[in-house]
A protein has these predicted regions:
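Mixed-charge, glycine-accented linear interaction segment located at domain edges/termini
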Residues: 145-169
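Glyoxalase I/VOC metalloenzyme domain signal
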Residues: 2, 27-30, 135, 152-156
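Residues forming well-ordered secondary-structure scaffolds
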Residues: 94, 111, 132, 149-156
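Conserved, surface-exposed functional patches that form binding/active-site neighborhoods
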Residues: 105, 110-143
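A short, polar/proline- and glycine-enriched secondary-structure boundary/capping micro-motif
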Residues: 77-83, 135-136, 146-148
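Short capping loops/turns at secondary-structure boundaries
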Residues: 20, 88, 127-130, 143-151
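N-terminal strand-loop-strand beta-hairpin
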Residues: 1-10, 14-120, 161-191
């Protein structure tokens, strides 16, 4: 999604939601009802590497393929804009080993993702190993479009899904795991 926009892409990353507060299973039928695509089931194993200029992660998929993703996103509360570059790989295991030796691992996140496409928004229903269930909204911004347009679109979608502002939490999964003292060596495959 959005790969035809050139090597550097812009996304608006919306809020994260905690299932204990909002009932993830109740959101699934609502997401299905408004989606043009999905559900698409994806297993993702993300290894984050030490990187001074942003974040770099290797995303391995269950079918043996992967993507090296470098991105920059502000460390601020609430919705944020993200700039990133993707590079596909057919050898994620070997690439993980090389990057781990060169840069060191900063964390690892393993998740089962159920993806829905609603217009230009990716709706992620995630089951994250050692963390729980979450919902994330990711709005693809067009060239020259303001982040505020992404915020407005995310808020409209939140209303359709029955999500309230009080149910939002901040932070990337790797940061939430780190806050709990769970780092790369504690990661395992989902059951």
């Amino acid at each position: 999604l959005g790969r035809n926009q050139g090597p550097c892409l812009r996304h608006f990353h919306g809020p994260w939601l905690c299932p204990a507060a909002f009932g993830l299973r109740r959101r699934l039928p609502k997401a299905k009802a408004i989606a043009s695509e999905g559900p698409i089931e994806i297993f993702q194993d993300d290894t984050f590497f030490n990187c001074e200029n942003g974040r770099m992660k290797l995303r391995a998929f269950s079918e043996g393929k992967g993507e090296l993703i470098f991105y920059r996103r502000a460390n601020q509360r609430g919705p944020k804009e993200s700039f990133y570059v993707l590079s596909p790989t057919s050898s994620p295991g070997t690439l993980r080993e090389a990057l781990s030796q060169a840069y060191g691992q900063a964390g690892r996140v393993e998740k089962h993702r159920t993806l829905f496409i609603v217009g230009r928004t990716r709706v992620h229903l995630d089951q994250v190993k050692n963390l729980g269930h979450f919902l994330e909204l990711e709005v693809v911004l067009q060239e020259g479009e303001s982040p505020e347009a992404g915020v407005q679109e995310a808020h409209k979608l939140m209303a359709k899904l029955g999500v309230e502002q009080s149910q939002l939490i901040d932070g990337a999964y790797v940061d939430l795991l780190s806050q709990r003292g769970l780092h790369a060596q504690n990661a395992g495959c989902p059951e």
